[in-house]
Design a protein with these regions (language model features):
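Residue-level marker for the onset of beta-strands and adjacent loop->beta junctions
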Residues: 1, 59, 70-72
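Arg/Lys-rich, positively charged N-terminal/basic patches that mediate binding to nucleic acids
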Residues: 1-31
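A structure-centric signal for secondary-structure junctions around beta-strands
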Residues: 2, 27, 57, 80-82
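Non-catalytic, surface-exposed connector residues within folded enzymatic/regulatory domains
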Residues: 5, 42-43, 98
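A broad, low-specificity signal marking well-ordered, structured residues that form hydrophobic/aromatic
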Residues: 5, 61, 83
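Enriched for short, Lys/Arg-rich terminal
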Residues: 13, 64-109
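A short beta-strand-loop micro-motif that forms or neighbors metal/cofactor-
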Residues: 23, 30-38, 80
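A short, surface-exposed loop/turn module that caps and links secondary-structure elements
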Residues: 35-64
Length: 109
């Protein structure tokens, strides 16, 4: 089953700001993950996030694109079979997680 993918407007901007090869990698990863975006402990592809370095991302998941050094942070909305993309960005010094925390607060997620 494919879940619906929805992006925060800021995440759409993140995707557009990537270079062409990075964008292709991210879209391929999202296409794969949307088949089963649940956490790995439920048999899905998402790695659960928690409360670390002042960023409480409990209930959110990530997908790592190691070769590109990118992360995709998202939330699963089970009642709507939806995968909500919060941020797409470089792993650099946990910065992507700080951005995710800010967007979660701004959007009351």
């Amino acid at each position: 089953m494919n879940w619906e993918v929805e992006y925060l407007p800021e995440a759409e901007s993140d995707l557009k700001s990537l270079d062409g090869s990075q964008r292709i990698l991210v879209l391929k990863a999202i296409k794969k993950v949307k088949q089963y975006p649940l956490p790995i402990f439920e048999g899905g592809y998402g790695k659960p996030l928690g409360n670390k370095n002042g960023n409480d991302l409990s209930g959110f998941l990530k997908v790592k694109l190691k070769s590109a050094g990118l992360r995709v942070v998202y939330k699963v909305v089970k009642q709507n079979d939806k995968m909500l993309i919060i941020v797409i960005g470089a792993r650099a010094d946990e910065e992507v997680y700080g951005i995710a925390q800010k967007r979660i607060q701004e959007n009351d997620l």
